[in-house]
Amino acid sequence: MRHPDDMPYLRHILDAIARVEEYTRGVDQEAFERTPLVQDGVIRQIMVIGEAVKLLSEELRDKYPSIPWRDVARMRDTLIHRYFGINV
């Protein structure tokens, strides 16, 4: 059973994934690398996902151990704190 407080965060994650898909539809690697607007949009949504993951209950995260929750959260931290070292 899902923790009722998890639902808003799960919605944020799904919305962010949908936005990344929308922003990158028809965009190949080369176009992504030369389009800062798309990069910024994708990076922002990855940060949203990472923050939402941090707020999910331990119960939910434990229920799905195959999902690398900590890696997702760390990606958010990397994007926030080491922004100038990011290589897209």
List where the protein language model places each region.
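Solvent-exposed interaction patches of small proteins and small membrane subunits
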Residues: 1-88
